[in-house]
Amino acid sequence: NNHGLQIQQQQQRNLSLHEYMSMELLQEAGVSIPKGHVAKSPDEAYAIAKKLGSKDVVIKAQVLAGGRGKGTFESGLKGGVKIVFSPEEAKAVSSQMIGKKLFTKQTGEKGRICNQVLVCERRYPRREYYFAITMERSFQGPVLIGSSQGGVNIEDVAAETPEAIVKEPIDIVEGIKKEQAVRLAQKMGFPPSIVDSAAENMIKLYNLFLKYDATMVEINPMVEDSDGAVLCMDAKINFDSNSAYRQKKIFDLQDWTQEDERDKDAAKANLNYIGLDGNIGCLVNGAGLAMATMDIIKLHGGTPANFLDVGGGATVHQVTEAFKLITSDKKVLSILVNIFGGIMRCDVIAQGIVMAVKDLEIKIPVVVRLQGTRVDDAKALIADSGLKILACDDLDEAAKMVVKLSEIVTLTKQAQVDVKFQLPI
């Protein structure tokens, strides 16, 4: 039952927080977690380990990338999660993490800088479970997901033993009921003596999910420890960027050192940008058209350097910022602008293109394909600018042209020849 609500699709850029920040939110919500604190220097790590007073503590590198346990630091240290047995060892290990880049499968060769570590007590799990809350289209709302197989990659569990994953949809209007949480805890295999405790933690996590407009709360693992207590050992929370206006406290926590510089600039200019490995820059309005443009470039033997959707209501300023983003990538050898003007006016895009080409002194070829609202005004603006911008009405032709031009620029670079492009308007 969707209560007659019309679900409107929106562009979404999810915010991810560091584990220690997520754990602090869990603690505030009354969820059971191991004791621990974040350290920004080896000396702080020493002091926290000493204060915890347990015979062994866990040092966890704080980087926004998966697979840290199997990663390698530039210091040579293997693994982003380490068990240590003294405050001195905590200091030594954290000194090989803090201020160093961690390389994992997810980060690739760029790596991610580790600026802090989480120092926490070691607990001994008797059993590990997987628990998550996410939004699922098939249920038109939130769903609780649980599995008796925690502490491992849930994608592997889904592929190998899908029956080990259980789901409990929640009616977003009525909210979570205790019997739903209890039912899930039982299906996940929690012993009867701690089913209620597990269910209570699930309800608190669901309330946190709602309170902060999260798109996902993932606990892997949720455990029964050797004392028979239910604990959340790790937390990953994603937040919907559309809620930034009412979740200022959360969005102010964003760690920009973990983001690609270009993603940071794109977020400031309110552009949907993803950097890729190719050499043909793309500037398009609408995510669907942007993907189709990348496909047609690939079809003609080229490789896109980015996904960039300027959206339906782009301003001259945003178009200029989009060009800055594209040209900041030194791999880009040619640019294809593909605009279909519905709400978006082609003449506004043309003004932005002309301004960007002039201000940024763009030396690489720019191919522009414009169709729709005020297209004739746009073409006149480009023609009157006196700039060497190549206009083309047909997308297929435009794609062929931009691929060919990128090949020519590649050849001139290899031959170390400086070529000035005199393109017909």
UniProtKB/Swiss-Prot annotation:
<keyword id="KW-0067">ATP-binding</keyword>
<protein>
    <recommendedName>
        <fullName>Succinate--CoA ligase [ADP-forming] subunit beta, mitochondrial</fullName>
        <ecNumber>6.2.1.5</ecNumber>
    </recommendedName>
</protein>
<feature type="binding site">
    <location>
        <begin position="342"/>
        <end position="344"/>
    </location>
    <ligand>
        <name>substrate</name>
    </ligand>
</feature>
<feature type="modified residue" description="N6-acetyllysine">
    <location>
        <position position="101"/>
    </location>
</feature>
<comment type="subunit">
    <text>Heterodimer of an alpha and a beta subunit. The beta subunit determines specificity for ATP. Interacts with ALAS2.</text>
</comment>
<feature type="modified residue" description="Phosphothreonine">
    <location>
        <position position="303"/>
    </location>
</feature>
<feature type="binding site">
    <location>
        <position position="285"/>
    </location>
    <ligand>
        <name>substrate</name>
    </ligand>
</feature>
<feature type="modified residue" description="N6-acetyllysine">
    <location>
        <position position="40"/>
    </location>
</feature>
<feature type="site" description="Important for substrate specificity">
    <location>
        <position position="56"/>
    </location>
</feature>
<feature type="binding site">
    <location>
        <position position="220"/>
    </location>
    <ligand>
        <name>Mg(2+)</name>
    </ligand>
</feature>
<dbReference type="Pfam" id="PF08442">
    <property type="entry name" value="ATP-grasp_2"/>
</dbReference>
<feature type="modified residue" description="N6-acetyllysine">
    <location>
        <position position="330"/>
    </location>
</feature>
<dbReference type="GO" id="GO:0046872">
    <property type="term" value="F:metal ion binding"/>
</dbReference>
<feature type="modified residue" description="N6-succinyllysine; alternate">
    <location>
        <position position="50"/>
    </location>
</feature>
<feature type="domain" description="ATP-grasp">
    <location>
        <begin position="23"/>
        <end position="250"/>
    </location>
</feature>
<keyword id="KW-0496">Mitochondrion</keyword>
<feature type="modified residue" description="N6-acetyllysine; alternate">
    <location>
        <position position="50"/>
    </location>
</feature>
<feature type="site" description="Important for substrate specificity">
    <location>
        <position position="124"/>
    </location>
</feature>
<dbReference type="InterPro" id="IPR005809">
    <property type="entry name" value="Succ_CoA_ligase-like_bsu"/>
</dbReference>
<feature type="modified residue" description="N6-acetyllysine">
    <location>
        <position position="178"/>
    </location>
</feature>
<keyword id="KW-0597">Phosphoprotein</keyword>
<dbReference type="GO" id="GO:0006104">
    <property type="term" value="P:succinyl-CoA metabolic process"/>
</dbReference>
<keyword id="KW-0816">Tricarboxylic acid cycle</keyword>
<feature type="modified residue" description="Phosphoserine">
    <location>
        <position position="241"/>
    </location>
</feature>
<keyword id="KW-0809">Transit peptide</keyword>
<dbReference type="GO" id="GO:0006099">
    <property type="term" value="P:tricarboxylic acid cycle"/>
</dbReference>
<feature type="transit peptide" description="Mitochondrion">
    <location>
        <begin position="1"/>
        <end position="14"/>
    </location>
</feature>
<feature type="modified residue" description="N6-acetyllysine">
    <location>
        <position position="91"/>
    </location>
</feature>
<feature type="binding site">
    <location>
        <position position="60"/>
    </location>
    <ligand>
        <name>ATP</name>
    </ligand>
</feature>
<keyword id="KW-0436">Ligase</keyword>
<comment type="function">
    <text>ATP-specific succinyl-CoA synthetase functions in the citric acid cycle (TCA), coupling the hydrolysis of succinyl-CoA to the synthesis of ATP and thus represents the only step of substrate-level phosphorylation in the TCA. The beta subunit provides nucleotide specificity of the enzyme and binds the substrate succinate, while the binding sites for coenzyme A and phosphate are found in the alpha subunit.</text>
</comment>
<dbReference type="GO" id="GO:0005739">
    <property type="term" value="C:mitochondrion"/>
</dbReference>
<dbReference type="GO" id="GO:0005524">
    <property type="term" value="F:ATP binding"/>
</dbReference>
<feature type="modified residue" description="Phosphotyrosine">
    <location>
        <position position="46"/>
    </location>
</feature>
<comment type="similarity">
    <text>Belongs to the succinate/malate CoA ligase beta subunit family. ATP-specific subunit beta subfamily.</text>
</comment>
<feature type="modified residue" description="N6-acetyllysine">
    <location>
        <position position="400"/>
    </location>
</feature>
<feature type="binding site">
    <location>
        <position position="234"/>
    </location>
    <ligand>
        <name>Mg(2+)</name>
    </ligand>
</feature>
<dbReference type="InterPro" id="IPR013650">
    <property type="entry name" value="ATP-grasp_succ-CoA_synth-type"/>
</dbReference>
<dbReference type="GO" id="GO:0042709">
    <property type="term" value="C:succinate-CoA ligase complex"/>
</dbReference>
<dbReference type="GO" id="GO:0004775">
    <property type="term" value="F:succinate-CoA ligase (ADP-forming) activity"/>
</dbReference>
<keyword id="KW-0547">Nucleotide-binding</keyword>
<dbReference type="InterPro" id="IPR017866">
    <property type="entry name" value="Succ-CoA_synthase_bsu_CS"/>
</dbReference>
